[in-house]
Amino acid sequence: METGRGKRGRGTGSVSDFQFPVSSNRLAPRGRKIYEGKWKILYETQDPALLIQRFKDTPMVGGAAPRAKLPRRGAMKNQISAAVFRLLQKNGIPTHFVEVVGERDMLVRRLEMIRLEVVLRNIAAGSLAKRLGMEVGTTLPAPVLEFYYKSDALGDPLLNEYHVRALGLASSEELRAIRETTFRANGVLLPFFAEREILLADFKLEFGRQKGALLVGDELTPDGCRFWDRTTRENLGKDWARRSLAREAAAYQEIFRRVCT
């Protein structure tokens, strides 16, 4: 199993000095916008099987007023996600990622997305700790897998597998593949981040269909992962993002330095 280079700690590079790598691709020109969400915009390309996924610097909150801009957020999200997608693909886990084609843009395979957020928890935190009365920071005896229904109107409720099938979101075979892929991804990601002095408390995956196959889609960034410093257990991910723009910027830059520089 490939987990990246040798042990790494805090990076020393400056985000402002980093030259964000971009691949040249004839499909890079963006076409019609087909989707815009909180964090991303999707555009068509000349190939109907491929899309441009653009990461925003300024996400929308509740579809209304935007949050304050975090400079180069989109570029950092793009590079962090690309690095993790490449790692998963090297370890036999298929994703929608093709290549980076712009500072904030990646070329991705067009998927029929499944309306599930699949959360894998290694450490008690967030809603799990609150819901079950567990002490935050407790290492779980075994990873916990959860499903959430992607529905803004319903508040993304927690589901079990019977709910998933009752709603027609995924078949039993697809759920089995999703479970297996998520646990495999955890086995790849844990040592990768540990080498960078990061504890992966939990993370979110989304899946989509392409020609009968299930692929990991969406993104893998601090907005969907709970990262802690391995030594201090200082928050480096989405917990910081919920407090202030300054702390969110510091969290993003620290994760970016450890993963991408």
Residue locations for each model-derived region?
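A long amphipathic alpha-helix within ATP-dependent nucleotide-binding catalytic cores
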Residues: 169-201
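Active-site loop/lid in soluble adenylation, ligation, and acyl-transfer enzymes
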Residues: 29-149, 259
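Arg/Gly-rich low-complexity intrinsically disordered repeat tracts
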Residues: 1-11, 15-24
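Conserved metal-phosphate-binding beta-hairpin within the catalytic cores
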Residues: 120, 200-218
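Phosphate-binding core of ATP-grasp and ATP-grasp-like enzymes
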Residues: 138, 143-155, 186-199, 221-226
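C-terminal helix-cap and adjacent tail motif
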Residues: 138, 220-261
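A short glycine-rich, hydrophobically flanked beta-strand micro-motif that places a catalytic Asp/Glu
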Residues: 96-104, 193-208
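Short histidine-centered catalytic/ligand-binding loop motif
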Residues: 65-75, 158-181
